[in-house]
């Protein structure tokens, strides 16, 4: 139920954040650090920043998001660097645009460290409570929240980060129970309040695999997946880097017996049995989906991953399911190495309410209620990193809203988190959204190594980057610039002793002379090769050397992509008048008129990314705007 002011508030805050998962923690920390008195409300104080599925951070596209959150002053990258069990850089044999750092983290340690951080953050209060109602003012602006038991708290901004808890229901086979995740009750009431206010809500599904006792596994039958010898970092702040002993993950595979067992029991699955019809994540399918969709595959990789240093549970990645418990155990015991495994927790599917993010502006403030923001799985995403990125953006803008400042919109050409939010706000998504490198048109520019170069100046301007971090950033950028200048100006000659050595080493001629930058551009030649011939700079840090090499080696491609961005930006940043009557523009297709009226894009670029709006419609819209402009200035 929606309440109208005046309401007697138990306490008054600037910002209230509903939910203390990965989005909620980032949002609350951001608002508190920006000087807002903040209340973080959660169902369970002992489950702050819990990792209910895979305890891992990073991976393709997700690592770029994590680096970007850190570059802006967020927390998730620091958390992974403090609590990792294993780190690996994925896709290292491919180009730098798709390099992806991934960390397996200690589940309990991660939650404990984050809990300590939010508990000790100035301006931030944490309380248990289930928000069921919103308090609005006379102009439908947010003024506070009410909990299930009637406590009211006032605020100028409210951020909803409810994860899978909103109307959550977990399924194992044909059995279900209300729950946000196993062992924790669902949140009720808030969906009905949002519906009352005219918001559209829907249902999505996700799932998590079983956990098995690591003492019951035969490791001799598993293929070890060791960590990288050279540890890489998510955070650009060396102060949070913790060198620690790493652990192995392991690999096994499904067998013909696994596949047959699943086929024989498909009718018992919540999805295939017809018990639920919510859409699940396309890029993280259940094992049943894999067997059905990829029937020609004889086997699927299954990764066995530790959940902590002192935790007996192993996470069975790639084996999520909603089949009954007895079937799950039989399935697990068909995997090599797990023939005698003990299942400690069964896999389950969870369905929950979400609010399609087309009802939000790119600031993540809702279009219907000023001061109300949404972030994380309520917006239709899946993944801790996607949630953290949205939480940070929502937190920044919630703070700026109550401070009377303009809201920040991140462009898709400037960041992965801008791409993520742009997709959410302009596309009618009906399945859980996962960030992929292929979703960005500008991935060569939006690399992990330059996330600080792209976003830390903005983080400083916003107020989340302190003097120490700013000094570190400026020193790093100065070192990179100076080294590039040195490499472009230092020349070696064909007849020099070092020149002859390089020719012998590379089996490529030097015609007269060559600058070191051109040498670095050659395929197969890298910065460590310069160092072999005493032509490197020993004072540079490893991450600075990496950035220098990438910027030189791929300079042609980078310049070409920058040119493309500039060309696209000429029209894409053109703002659309608020309240524009698209239904009156007869040169637009009827579908375009309906979609533009529904989504109310802010710019031409956003309009062009809405499904059903084609290039001809965009041209017609540009012509219409130009005609209106001429009429307005003509005497």
UniProtKB/Swiss-Prot annotation:
Keywords: Cytoplasm, FAD, Flavoprotein, NAD, tRNA processing. One of its GO terms (cellular component) is cytoplasm. SUPFAM superfamilies: FAD/NAD(P)-binding domain. It comes from the Bacteria. It holds the Pfam family GIDA_C_1st. Belongs to the MnmG family. This is tRNA uridine 5-carboxymethylaminomethyl modification enzyme MnmG. The gene is mnmG.
